Each structure stands twice: as structure tokens, then as C-alpha cells.
Amino acid sequence: MGQAATHVDANYTLINYTEEVIEDDRDACAVADDPKYPSSFGITLAVPEWEAICTAIVLTLIIISTIVGNILVILSVFTYKPLRIVQNFFIVSLAVADLTVAILVLPLNVAYSILGQWVFGIYVCKMWLTCDIMCCTSSILNLCAIALDRYWAITDPINYAQKRTLERVLLMIGVVWVLSLIISSPPLLGWNDWPDVFEPDTPCRLTSQPGFVIFSSSGSFYIPLVIMTVVYFEIYLATKKRLRDRAKATKISTISSGQNKYNNKDDHHDQDSVSSEANHNEHQGVTRLVSDNEKKKRTRKLTPKKKPKRKYWSKDDKSQNKLIIPILSNENSVTDMGENLENRNTSSESNSKETHEDDLIEVNETVPVKTHHKKPKPNQQSAVYQFIEEKQRISLTRERRAARTLGIIMGVFVVCWLPFFVIYLVIPFCASCCLSNKFINFITWLGYCNSALNPLIYTIFNMDFRRAFKKLLCMKP
């Protein structure tokens, strides 16, 4: 029993010694990197005065740009009609999250970074840290929701267009904010290592409890990062496949268009022959109305030689047929038909001198009926194909631009937040890792910069947002 008790006491002493060493190491890191600098303002600073002034200016500009940019995004969606669509409510939610970061989190962080000590009390510290976790988590989860929305819209556009209702979007946004609250609230409920009493030199920092660090970093960053990586890769593959399918469809339609042009020539030749015969019969009906002495003369003038319908084209038909041709024909066929019209008009002018106006009226009433095509012309089909292809091209261009914008947003998100969350996850398990306050402040503000960069990304890569921003800022488009 005595040996057992001695063994237990030895283990307890070792544990206490280890904890004391860890605390001493942390305190040593804090003391070694905690110099104070006097200033002309009568307060001590964590950095030299010139550095404090420069830091304050830079960080204040970041805060102002974050506030202004995200307010412009919110106003653009609600005031500019092309942006007033359901899926843009995700962007509004993201802008609200970034705006709360700029208003509730960043100003206190500026003061804390420059002063090097927390002077606002323990309760403000707890609320500030909770808002920090919740708002940053909401910003990241909103990016994840936007990625999922784009993924469903591209991979299943028909079904998802019916499912993407305002209620569904608002439900997803609500889930994002509820999850953010769940991830950020445990420290307020006791899952923390905060001191009970704050001294002037007591740091206000995120809890380093290993369990909470793993829980919060996974929910706030690592799980959304995995989801966005997989989703964006699927979006890339789906967009690439659709572009490849469109290229194949374009080749097929080009070949089909060429075949239609060839068939159009044959059909035109056959229709001319039928029209010639029909017009010949009509001309015979016309010649019965005149006297027998003029019958042979009129028959010679009205009887077609090669293409008789060209000789029965009055001047009044010129404008009428020119209005029809651009609709029924493509660019190449307009030139050919234009030449035929010139020949027909010339022939009409020469024949109108030798025939009576009444005869022309009677012939003109019958000729258009005989030359009318009951089936749609191949040129009409080609125009329809071109219209559909153009609509598909515009749609795919928008999808590709949206996917590219999403990829840039995700890339900026990773660059901004990955350093912070790597350090945040490593520190609780590495007591001997001494990091300077300047480095910690840098990676923390690098993450905050993500809230300022999102509106800039929209402005650069989205034409509608650019127009809306210019309209809100009273700039000429």
C-alpha cells in the first residue's frame, strides 16, 4: 500500500509539474513578446507610435471598405432589378455576415492590436469572442451554401429551378445562421478556459480547450472547405462536359445546315418548275379575256421561256417581298434573293409597258398563291437553330462566369482563412510553440480581409453588380 501510495503521489507530482511547465512556457512566450512603448498620447502601446499610427490607418481603411462594399452589395440586390432574384439572397446573407464582422468585431480588434491589452472588461470580451466566431463562421458557411446552390443549378437545372423557391432559400440561410450560433455558443455555456477575474494584463483570446478547438475549427472551416472543394470540382466537370456537348452539337448543326442549303437549291428548282407550269395555265386563263386578234401576241409576251414568274412581278411587290426575305433567309441567301428581286423588278418594268394594268392585277392575285411554300423553308429552320444555339451559348457563358467567380471566391477564402485555422488548431497541442503577437494579428486580419474582398470579387467579375454599383454611386455606366 505504501509503495502504491508513493507511486500515485509521484505521478500526481509529475502531472502537476508538467502543467506548471506548460503554463510557464506560455507565460514565458507572453512575457518575451510583450514589450510596451510610450506614446505622445499618454498611453502605452504594444508597438512603436509610428507603427501604431500606420496600423490604425490601414486597419481602418479595411473596416471602411468592408462596410461600404457589403452595404453596396445588399442595396444592389434590393434596388437593381436584374439582381432581384431568389439565389442572390445567399449573397445578401453573406454580405450581412461580412458587415457584422466589420461592425462588431474589427473595431475592438484594432484597439486590442495597438494597445496590446484588453481594457474593456470580461463580459465585453466574452461577447466579442462569441460574435467573432459566429460572424466569421456564418460568412464561411454562406460561401458553402452559395457553392451548393450553384452546383444544383448546373448539374440539375430543370428540377432545381422548380425547387429553388424563396422559402427553400430562406430555410437554407436560416440553417447557416443557426449552425453558426451552435458552433460559437459553447464557450458561453462553460466550454472554455477563460479566467474568472480579468486583470489589466489578462489576455482576451479564444479558448484553447482542445475539444472545443477541434469542434469549432471543423464546423467553421475544415468541413465547409471539404464540401466547397468537392462541389467546385463537380461544377468544373459539369461545365466542361456541357461545353464539350455543345461543341459536338454545333458541329452537327453546321453539317445539317449545309445539307439544308443543298436541299434548298433542289427544292427551289422543283418549285420553279411547278410554278412555271401553274403560271402557264393561269396565263392561258388571262389570254381568254382578250380578243382573238391579240391572243397570239399576248401569249408570246406572257408565255414563260425559262423562269416565267420573273415576268409577272409588279412594282408594288418590291417592298412587300423585301420585308419577307430577311425573316425567311440567312445572310448568304439574302444576297441571292436580292439579285433575283432586281431581275424580277427589271423584268416587271419592261413588261408593264406592253401589258395592261388590269391583266397584271389579275395575274398578281394568282402568282403569290402558286409560289407559296406550305412547309417551312430550310433557311427558317437554320435561323431557329442559330437562335437556340445563341441562347445556349449565352447560358453556358453565364454558367462558366458564375463558376469562375465561385472558384475565385473560394480561392480567396482559402488563402485568407487557412493560415489562421492551421495555427488555431495547432496551438492547443503545442505548448512550446511561441508565436509573436504581430504574427497572430497578421493571420487574424488576413482572415478578416476575406469579408472585404468578397464585394470586390463581385464587382470585378459580375456585370450586373458593376452596373448596380455605378448606379448607386451616381456614376455614368
From Swiss-Prot:
Glycans are attached at residues 11, 16. It comes from the Eukaryota. Residues 263-272, 279-295 have a biased composition (Basic and acidic residues). GO terms for cellular component: plasma membrane. InterPro entries: GPCR_Rhodpsn, GPCR_Rhodpsn_7TM, Octopmn_rcpt. GO terms for molecular function: octopamine receptor activity. Pfam families: 7tm_1 (PF00001). It is a multi-pass membrane protein. Belongs to the G-protein coupled receptor 1 family. Its main location: membrane. This is Octopamine receptor. Residues 296-312 have a biased composition (Basic residues). It is found in: Cell membrane. The chain crosses the membrane at residues 56-78, 89-110, 128-148, 169-191, 217-238, 406-427, 440-460. Residues 256-317, 334-358 are annotated as: Disordered. Residues 79-88, 149-168, 239-405, 461-477 are cytoplasmic. CDD domains: 7tmA_tyramine_octopamine_R-like. SUPFAM superfamilies: Family A G protein-coupled receptor-like. Residues 1-55, 111-127, 192-216, 428-439 are extracellular. Keywords: Cell membrane, G-protein coupled receptor, Glycoprotein, Membrane, Receptor, Transducer, Transmembrane, Transmembrane helix. PROSITE patterns: G_PROTEIN_RECEP_F1_1, G_PROTEIN_RECEP_F1_2. Receptor for octopamine. Octopamine (OA) is a neurotransmitter, neurohormone, and neuromodulator in invertebrates. The activity of this receptor is mediated by G proteins which activate adenylyl cyclase.
